[in-house]
Amino acid sequence: MERRVAARTRVLKRGTVELPESALPCKIIDLSDTGARLALSGANHVPNFFTLLIPDRPPVFCQIIWRRQERLGVTFRELPVL
């Protein structure tokens, strides 16, 4: 059953998973207005919430929806208010 709100487009861009103590390079496999599929080493160690840096776009706060080996499915969230 398809649960996506918006269709994803294959993009194959480089991005960065920004964490409080480090940054991990990733490949953005596909992208929509509401989420993305990412490939990166150490995907199992990425916390459930993080900031994704995509070239030519503002940073986006993400929540992991699924994990499979070196891949993550994320949905975009509002940045938390501090």
Segments (PLM) and residue ranges:
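Structured alpha-helical
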Residues: 1-82
